[in-house]
UniProtKB/Swiss-Prot annotation:
Keywords: Ethylene biosynthesis, Fruit ripening, Iron, Metal-binding, Oxidoreductase, Vitamin C. This is 1-aminocyclopropane-1-carboxylate oxidase 1. The gene is ACO1. It comes from the Eukaryota. It comes from Solanum lycopersicum. Predominantly expressed in the petals and the stigma and style. Its cofactor is Fe cation. InterPro entries: DIOX_N, IPNS-like_FE2OG_OXY, IPNS-like_sf, Oxoglu/Fe-dep_dioxygenase_dom, Plant_2OG-oxidoreductases. The lineage of its organism: Eukaryota, Viridiplantae, Streptophyta, Embryophyta, Tracheophyta. The keyword Iron applies.
Length: 315
């Protein structure tokens, strides 16, 4: 089995740039995932985020999760649970407008730390989108502009904790799915594993590494690249020991952004020169995804194709 792609972003600044860009290209084409080291976010910032996120879970979320487990009788289940996940979560929205000041139970220091972390992640996401543009032969800024809509991108962080699970064979931490959006930046626990992706019909562990950022591609990048890059099924396996922390930040198109394959990539395809993917408004896709998240993505694309006969505003 090939090694999971780990990319040192510092090497973009020297004589290993071409090789590093090739590694990113291969990861996007063949994995849909890669792990970044030396990505520019200071280790001390990440350490503070981790410490405060784990502290907040202990103080504000842990007891609620225990009560939820008890109310649903999850510790005594005898058959596979298919309609919920063994996770405790809350969501922070950064763009187009932040909700951090409104989220209850966060102390002011944690709010400030997360605002700062979000700005750094936003910058990194946009840098990565331009690296993808370079590899795809698209002009710099193409993907950011494709995501922009009228109010800019949607950007937010799902803060998750996966407590020890007594029945990991029957309850998933998070059921298998592809991500609906654009590019996802994950800061995950470096001690408690659980994230897996599907490659060549095998589930492969995404290795926990201290101070790394795991990147994966969402459905919208598959559409814009006309299938050259793919969103990939992934899941979280619950563990019997240790609580796994996960901060997944989703840099997504704006709600009214019109998504469609880049014309140059359609033209570059072989003789057929066909556009395989539909054209749609991102918010319409999200409404469909909300009910079908844990099902295959292909029927979602087909459903959006069926809607294409309707005129799309601003297309």
């Amino acid at each position: 089995m090939e090694n999971f792609p780990i990319i040192n972003l510092e090497k973009l600044n020297g004589d290993e740039r071409a090789n590093t860009m090739e590694m990113i290209k291969d990861a996007c084409e063949n994995w849909g995932f890669f792990e970044l080291v030396n990505h520019g976010i200071p280790h001390e910032v990440m350490d503070t985020v981790e410490k405060m996120t784990k502290g907040h879970y202990k103080k504000c979320m842990e007891q609620r999760f225990k009560e939820l487990v008890a109310s649903k009788g999850l510790e005594a289940v005898q058959a596979e649970v298919t309609d919920l996940d063994w996770e405790s979560t809350f969501f922070l929205r950064h763009l187009p407008t932040s909700n951090i000041s409104q989220v209850p139970d966060l102390d002011e220091e944690y709010r400030e730390v997360m605002r700062d972390f979000a700005k750094r992640l936003e910058k990194l996401a946009e840098e990565l989108l331009d690296l993808l543009c370079e590899n795809l032969g698209l002009e710099k800024g193409y993907l950011k502009n494709a995501f922009y809509g009228s109010k800019g991108p949607n950007f937010g962080t799902k803060v998750s904790n996966y407590p020890p699970c007594p029945k990991p064979d029957l309850i998933k931490g998070l059921r298998a799915h592809t991500d609906a959006g654009g590019i996802i930046l994950l800061f995950q626990d470096d001690k408690v594993s659980g994230l897996q992706l599907l490659k060549d019909e095998q589930w492969i562990d995404v290795p926990p590494m201290r101070h790394s950022i795991v990147v994966n591609l969402g459905d919208q990048l598959e559409v814009i690249t006309n299938g050259k890059y793919k969103s990939v099924l992934h899941r979280v396996i619950a563990q019997t020991d240790g609580t796994r922390m996960s901060l997944a930040s989703f840099y997504n198109p704006g709600s009214d952004a019109v998504i469609y394959p880049a014309k140059t990539l359609v033209e570059k395809e072989a003789e057929e020169s066909t556009q395989v993917y539909p054209k749609f408004v991102f918010d319409d896709y999200m409404k469909l995804y909300a009910g079908l998240k844990f099902q295959a993505k292909e029927p979602r694309f087909e459903a959006m194709k069926a809607m294409e006969s309707d005129p799309i505003a601003s297309a």
